[in-house]
UniProtKB/Swiss-Prot annotation:
Family stated for the protein in its record: Belongs to the CheD family.
GO biological processes: chemotaxis
Name of protein: Probable chemoreceptor glutamine deamidase CheD
Underlying gene: cheD
Reaction it catalyzes: L-glutaminyl-[protein] + H2O = L-glutamyl-[protein] + NH4(+)
């Protein structure tokens, strides 16, 4: 099965997958499904049978996009709002606008319909607890505006606060999970049933 993880510091797509290995979720359950990690400023997409995971999120936000029709999922680990500087040659996917363009492009390459995508957002915390630090707020505003401009629904968000977060998406089941701080992993959203496990969060 084809897997794509892209960073714009390289000309070609960069593959970040681990075959036959395992990881443990917040409940200590062992998972054998190969997974792909999106680190800061990276974008990844894959079809059914893969698990997409963000590295820890502070003020960064994980954009988790999914096409239920093809079971193609994508994850962008966004670091900064807006567009990259005009002179930037690398690191463009750290910025919200460029990261979304890359995300939708690589998902389409995997067979997704760009008009059929459902979105969840995770992260955007003020982990340093600085009173005048607004980067986490700016990231959320930038991404929300750009996504709504494309008339794509934002189904669920888990943003804000002061604790690090992580995102995990199962492309086969259409479920997205989030971890906050040292707490156990929780299901945030089911892209097929639209069920929310923790509606009061």
């Amino acid at each position: 099965m084809k897997k794509t993880a892209k960073t714009d510091t390289e000309d070609a797509f960069k593959f970040r997958s681990t075959f036959g290995e395992h990881y443990y979720d917040g409940y200590g359950a062992r998972h054998e499904t190969p997974h792909i990690v999106a680190y800061t400023g990276e974008v990844t997409a894959a079809g059914p049978g893969r698990v997409l995971i963000s590295s820890p999120l502070g003020s960064c936000i994980a954009v988790c996009a999914y096409d239920p029709g093809t079971r193609v999922g994508g994850l962008a680990h966004v670091m900064l709002p807006g567009v990259p500087p005009a002179h930037a040659e690398t690191g463009k996917d750290r910025y919200a606008a460029h990261a979304l363009e890359t995300l939708f492009s690589v998902m389409q390459n995997e067979g997704a319909d760009p008009g059929n995508l459902l979105i969840c957002l995770i992260g955007g915390a003020n982990v340093l607890r600085r009173e005048h630090d607004t980067i986490h707020i700016d990231n959320l505003r930038s991404l929300t505006s750009l996504i709504l401009q494309r008339n794509l629904p934002i189904c669920r968000t888990m943003t804000g606060g002061s604790e690090r977060m992580m995102a995990r998406m199962e492309t086969k089941t259409g479920r997205i999970f989030q971890t906050t701080g040292n707490n156990p992993e929780e299901m945030l959203f089911d892209y097929f049933t639209h069920n929310i496990e923790n509606p009061d969060n």
